[in-house]
């Protein structure tokens, strides 16, 4: 086999291997990626299709806590959605602050959250370190 053909064969083999590796990585990531939508974008998505993340602000005086769940309104200052969450809220969760919720849309006005993330700015310092 000539040197030129051998080099072409090795290059083709490396290209095929890298193509397969990229394909498998992207396929795996597709199943695990959870996109970040605004409230307005999330409302128009098909209900309950997949796990999504929605970001916005907690509406003032909208937080209702009872024994089994927390209910609050979240807005992007364009539209709002009611969020239902069962679990412990993060310590930085408060009204009029940023929040990202992960879960599924139940209907166009209710979001069932599995996880709640409180957003903060780059100057955040935990109380322990202050």
Swiss-Prot record:
Q: Which InterPro entries match?
A: CcmE (IPR004329), CcmE-like_sf (IPR036127), NA-bd_OB-fold (IPR012340)
Report the superkingdom from the record: Bacteria
List the ranges whose topology is Cytoplasmic: 1-7
Cell membrane: is it a keyword of this entry?
yes
Q: Which Gene3D superfamilies match?
A: Nucleic acid-binding proteins
Q: Name one GO molecular function term.
A: heme binding
Location of this chain's protein in the cell: Cell membrane
PANTHER family referenced in this protein's UniProt entry, alphabetically? CYTOCHROME C-TYPE BIOGENESIS PROTEIN CCME HOMOLOG, MITOCHONDRIAL
What family does the database annotate? Belongs to the CcmE/CycJ family.
Please report the name of this protein according to its UniProt entry: Cytochrome c-type biogenesis protein CcmE
Task: Tell me the organism.
Answer: Wolbachia pipientis wMel
